[in-house]
């Protein structure tokens, strides 16, 4: 099957699935794969034995329950991940899933960042404990409140777990939420222009 099978990856926004979506994914596993999929640490599900000729049918099926396979491979911004306890954690400043969704919508099919030097990973966390491992992502965002109660972010850059693992460095102690996307866009432009492509 190596010559005709492909891996299909589907992002799960913030790791949250409805029961309808879970049943839909189970149907894809049953009808197009070997009866199961693999949940990844990047909050995706992978099907590893998809026949290439069936890929259009799978994409159509995903769309029927509001899912897709956009930006799950290649040198682009990947699925934005969040704290697995987001929305329920006792120590969170605010639910980070809202911001993860905003970043996802901003980055999906962004024409300027469709061919980056390498795949690019963003994580967001809102708790005192960093359960999203933001220090090990290209951009790590930690939700914070200013002294006057304004929502913002501590921004970390340069983390990774690839062939040269490294811990991210703090780039900004506090960026107001209203400036988040323009700040991210600036980081992405620098990376796109100056990042290594070898």
Predicted segments, located by residue:
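Charge-rich, low-complexity segments
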Residues: 1, 132-134, 184, 192-198
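Gly-rich Lys/Arg/Thr-decorated short loops/hinges at beta-loop-alpha junctions or inter-strand turns
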Residues: 2-9, 163-168
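Small-residue-enriched alpha-helical segments and adjacent helix-cap loops
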Residues: 5-151, 182
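Short, compositionally biased low-complexity segments
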Residues: 71-79, 155-164, 192-197
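FAD-binding subdomain of flavoenzyme oxidoreductases
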Residues: 133-135, 144, 154-161, 166
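Internal alpha/beta scaffold segment
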Residues: 161-195
């Amino acid at each position: 099957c190596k010559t005709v099978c492909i891996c299909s990856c589907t992002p799960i926004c913030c790791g949250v699935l409805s029961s309808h979506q879970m049943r839909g994914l189970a149907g894809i596993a049953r009808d197009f794969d070997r009866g199961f999929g693999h949940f990844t640490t990047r909050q995706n599900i992978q099907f590893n034995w998809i026949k290439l000729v069936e890929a259009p049918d799978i994409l159509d099926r995903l769309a029927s329950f509001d899912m897709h396979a956009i930006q799950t491979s290649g040198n682009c911004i990947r699925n934005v991940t969040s704290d697995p306890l987001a929305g329920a954690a006792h120590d969170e400043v605010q639910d980070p899933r809202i911001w993860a969704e905003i970043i996802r919508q901003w980055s999906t099919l962004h024409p300027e960042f469709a061919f980056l030097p390498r795949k690019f990973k963003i994580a967001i966390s809102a708790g005192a404990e960093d359960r999203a491992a933001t220090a090990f992502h290209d951009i790590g965002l930690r939700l914070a409140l200013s002294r006057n109660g304004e929502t913002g972010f501590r921004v970390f850059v340069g983390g990774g777990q690839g062939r040269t693992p490294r811990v991210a460095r703090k780039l900004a102690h506090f960026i107001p939420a209203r400036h988040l996307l323009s700040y991210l866009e600036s980081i992405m432009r620098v990376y796109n222009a100056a990042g290594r492509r070898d």
